[in-house]
């Protein structure tokens, strides 16, 4: 059997592509999501879906305890879960700000806490891949400030943990994609979406499977020597 991988937001568009890639590479994959029906649709050998509310730190802790009992530990964590609320500053409601930061940053923080403990003593270089966003760096696009802040915080966590656990052979990287065709497109108006896609040099949005291929690379032995990096995927849009 391959490595044990945990993927958050597994039932979403990006999550399904990442799960498919890791399964194809021979890993046992545990997928977290609140979408029980979506997880059920993904049932196949090597995949275990767990209904986990990532807004609750206690639920995250309990889920990893269950994984420890079931599979003995964790080799790979992909923090993929996230959302983008579109309220404009300064009229962002407090609860929306808190939900944005909790799902995009705090959930990943708590998953890292739990996963790193279960990575101790495992063979080889263990991996954490955080799915960030090009929006944390490109201020010419439409992303609202609480979304940018949540993803920038995630990338700082990536760098801190990469340095902190380098000698423990835990490699931590972020992937920061630009426009990728997922259900989150639904939060955008037609004109905003059309303008954003038109800005992409290839004239199209990227596909979840393309991002998943980068996750697969970082998780593979070829990615062992990469840690502390924020890998920006945007077709060269923001080269200066």
Question: For the regions a protein language model found, what residue spans apply to each?
Answer:
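Canonical Rossmann dinucleotide-binding motif of NAD(H)/NADP(H)-dependent dehydrogenases/reductases
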Residues: 2-29
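Active-site loop of short-chain dehydrogenase/reductase
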Residues: 3, 73-74, 119-133, 167-170, ...
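Substrate-binding pocket helix/loop in short-chain dehydrogenase/reductase
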Residues: 88-89, 93-101, 185, 196
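Active-site helix of classical SDR
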Residues: 112, 150, 158
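Alpha-helical segment proximal to the catalytic Tyr-Lys
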Residues: 117, 159, 163-167, 224
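A conserved structural motif in NAD(P)-dependent oxidoreductases
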Residues: 200-211
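Short C-terminal tail/terminal secondary-structure segment
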Residues: 216, 227-240
């Amino acid at each position: 059997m391959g490595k044990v991988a945990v993927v958050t937001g597994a039932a979403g568009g990006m999550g399904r592509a990442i799960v498919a890639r890791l399964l194809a590479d021979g890993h046992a994959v545990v997928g977290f999501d609140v979408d029980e029906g979506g997880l059920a649709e993904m049932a196949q050998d090597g995949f275990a879906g767990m209904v986990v509310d990532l807004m609750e730190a206690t639920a995250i802790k309990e889920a990893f305890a269950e994984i420890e009992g079931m599979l003995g530990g964790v080799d790979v964590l992909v923090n993929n879960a996230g959302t983008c609320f579109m309220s404009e500053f300064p009229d962002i409601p407090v609860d929306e700000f808190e939900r944005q930061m909790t799902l995009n940053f705090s959930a990943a923080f708590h998953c890292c806490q739990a996963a790193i403990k279960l990575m101790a003593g495992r063979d080889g270089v263990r991996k954490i891949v955080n799915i960030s966003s090009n929006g944390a760096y490109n201020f010419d696009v439409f992303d609202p400030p609480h979304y940018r802040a949540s993803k920038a915080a995630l990338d700082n966590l990536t760098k801190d943990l990469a340095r902190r656990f380098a000698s423990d052979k835990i490699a931590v990287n972020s992937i920061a994609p630009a426009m990728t065709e997922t259900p989150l497109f639904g939060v955008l108006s037609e004109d905003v979406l059309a303008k954003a896609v038109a800005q992409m040099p290839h004239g199209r949005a990227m596909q979840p499977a393309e991002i998943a291929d980068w996750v697969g690379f970082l998780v593979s032995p070829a990615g062992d020597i990469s840690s502390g990096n924020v890998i920006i995927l945007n077709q060269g849009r923001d080269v200066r």
